[in-house]
Amino acid sequence: MWGLGDVWQNEAVYARLGCPLDEQVPVQGEELHFEHGHMLSRPDVTLIYVFLEQLQPQGWGAYVDTYQPSDLDSDPNVIVPTPASSGPRLVQPTGRFGKLWRENAWLREKLGWAVTLIPEAEAQPITSFTGAAQDFERGVLFWNGNVCFVLRTDDMSWDLY
């Protein structure tokens, strides 16, 4: 069976991340895509990872997930722009991702709007996943059930495996 160790054994990954700090842990998370990036939740450590430009310094960040069920799910005063007819449908992010997006103007500007690839879909494009995470001396391996994100803390760059 495939695991995070398979990615870590890649010489380039190992050299950048260093040694594991602990065992890999299972993660039941959520993911949301935006016009210019995406967010992944990591509930085991109450973080939201935000991904901007792949392979670029400062291309990702980790934010504390402060969302509570009593928080507003969305802001009724936010007006979603009409996208180009050929583009994905734009939506206001909701829940934990929406709270972070609404409270951080810099992230709103960098990420743009949440998107759904199914134009007629009315539901939020948030997807749940079963994955795994492992912390290292200089980064994190995070699997969302589909791909493995290699998060490097020396320059805050990331890559996919």
Give each language-model segment a name.
Residues 1-161:
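Extended, compositionally biased repeat/scaffold regions that form elongated interaction surfaces
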